[in-house]
From Swiss-Prot:
Main location: secreted
Leader sequence segment: 1-19
Propeptide, residue positions: 20-30
Locations listed in the record: Secreted; Nematocyst
Cysteine-cysteine disulfides: 37-72, 39-60, 53-73
Annotated family: Belongs to the sea anemone sodium channel inhibitory toxin family. Type I subfamily.
Expression sites (tissue/organ): Expressed in acontia, a specialised envenomation structure laden with batteries of venom-containing nematocysts found only in the superfamily Metridioidea.
Domain of life: Eukaryota
Lineage: Eukaryota, Metazoa, Cnidaria, Anthozoa, Hexacorallia
Organism: Calliactis polypus (Hermit crab anemone)
Name by which UniProt lists this protein: Sea anemone sodium channel inhibitor type I
Length: 76
């Protein structure tokens, strides 16, 4: 019984993760209320994104927010 429950949970999680991935809409960072950041040039401002910048956004600085590594991204 326990093995079947574990297998069911694992299959469900992987099924949802693989099924949702390609169909997820592009993030709307304007509505995200993200933390603002300043790029390396000191004048351009962007939004902190944990991990890497999403499509349509460009990298301008690597930074940390508390203990989360990420990038400061500006819209192209």
């Amino acid at each position: 019984m326990n093995r079947m429950l574990i297998i069911f949970v694992v299959v469900t999680v992987f099924g949802l993760a693989s099924g949702l991935g390609p169909n997820m809409p592009a993030p709307d960072l304007a509505k995200r209320n993200g933390k603002g950041c300043t790029c390396n040039d000191g004048t351009t401002t962007g939004i902190f994104w944990a991990g890497s910048c999403p499509g349509g956004w460009s990298y301008c600085k690597t930074m940390w927010y508390w203990v989360v590594p990420g990038e400061c991204c500006t819209q192209k």
